[in-house]
Amino acid sequence: PEGKLEFPEADLLGLNMEGPFISPVKKGAQDEKNIVPCNVEIAKRFLKASEGLVKFIGIAPAESSEAVAFIQEMKDSVDISLAHTNADYDTAMAAFAAGANHAVHLYNAMPAFTHRAPGVIGAVADSRHVMVELICDNVHIHPAVVRATFAMMGADRMVLISDSMRATGMPDGTYTLGGLDVSVNGNRATLVDGGALAGSVTNLMDCMRTVVKVMKIPLETAVACATANPARCLGVYDTYGSISEGKKADIVLLDEDLELKMVIKDGQLPFL
């Protein structure tokens, strides 16, 4: 694109739509006035406007009787995820059977997993084709739950995400997210009105480091969940996600404490 930097800091591989087709009950830090039931025509407008850059569309299947039809209509054009949903086990299983293949920040903005009501989490466990996002900032999920999820569902399905918002890397204070005021205190971001978690203020490198040091997941597993697994989700593993001949030379070098030492971008050394 015009104005491209000589050393761009990152490649934009796609956009993830976590709305507007979500549940008002599980809206998290989203403005309820923007929420609508899943709608094929609206989704197609987003895809057209983004020129194909939208790669994931999240839906709350319990909020619309047309959810299965929506998935069947859209699944060949975009990946469908379950996001900010109040669905029960059967509703989630029907969505996954129809072609939904991704779970947005598992455990957050969905019903809790219990022995009589397994909900979305139980449906994800029973649907081996579904990839699983985890926010491993040591705020959103307890370390024991992270370990249990890896054991129950398998590391090959885990995708580490930051879920970070605009205040990431900024001092404590008040910021905005989608028009809503957010209070940032340390590594926690919450809505000023109501106190709900409002995304995170961490980054993916810190999440990977936390997975290893706090949650006790092996380093090689954590790295794959931050690199190879997301690349496979996006369908770009032939270019990204591992250090292999013929792939992009995008590499981060860490020391023995997992602190960043160097970034290599496109085979160049823009950041030392």
Where is each model-derived feature located?
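Short, electropositive alpha-helical surface patch
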Residues: 1-6, 69-79, 218-219, 223
